[in-house]
Amino acid sequence: MLIKYLGHSCFWIEFGGKRLLIDPFIAGNPMASNINQNDLEVDYMLITHGHGDHIGDAIDIGQRTKAIAIANFEVQNWLVAQGIRAYAMNLGGKFKFDFGTVKMVSAIHSSVLPDGSNGGNPGGFVVWNESQSFYIAGDTALTYDMKLIPLTCPPLTFAILPLGDVFTMGYEDAIIASQWINCDLIIGCHFDTFEPIRIDHKKAQEAFAQAGKKLILPEIGQVINL
């Protein structure tokens, strides 16, 4: 599995023979100026909620690549109305796609679409096939619902957790989240993009290490091979 960090909460993941794009937000992110979204080959987009910093490039990329977006019902309807192929899910549901199974799980956050319309409930995704499994938390606070993931999904290879604080949980709560989901390899997201969510990398990584966890704080454009 190849994982490429495209900034903020956006990742390109090669999984199950398909190219997945998580929360597309590139053109509007000045930190990701080295990423050309027109170079991305995408089969599916997984969109956790409707905020612009998670869905900002979904229309452009969806129109160019004909990728299928996977999102909650309200976001799916909004995308379809703009000519994007999309599949609707909701919290607690799962579906087997041609790259693996996707389960939509709880996130504690807010959600409104860029035009001000209702974005429905925010969520996260657990994705798995016969050999690997990962959790995309989306924007969320620490929530006891995370304890359900090890009970209902395969053991996680890694998890993508927000840890910039202010708008999501900070790294201290992300450590607790990693314990509740029984995952030892965490890839951080939703940090350093804007001034309020800048973090101390050294302190965060040391805190994870003290908890017996590995934290990767990727640089934009970095590729991780698992």
Residue ranges and their predicted role:
Residues G28-N29, H51-G56, Q76-L79, G93-K96, ...:
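Active-site environment of divalent metal-dependent phosphoester hydrolases
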Residues M1-L2, Q63-I68, Q132-F134:
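Short active-site oxyanion
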Residues W12-H51, G56-D60, E74, S110-G116, ...:
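Pre-active-site segment of Zn-dependent metallo-hydrolases
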Residues L21-D23, V42-G50, I70-F73, Y135-T140, ...:
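Active-site neighborhood of phospho(di)ester-bond hydrolases with catalytic His/Asp-centered motifs
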Residues M1-R19, I26-N29, K96-K103, H109, ...:
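Zn-dependent metallo-beta-lactamase
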Residues I68, V80-G93, I175, Q179-L226:
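Binuclear metal-ion centers of metallo-dependent hydrolases, dominated by the metallo-beta-lactamase
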Residues L113-G123, W128-Q179:
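Active-site-proximal loop/helix segments of hydrolase catalytic cores
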Residues G56-L113:
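Glycine/small-residue-rich loop that forms an oxyanion/phosphate-binding "nest" at active or ligand-binding sites
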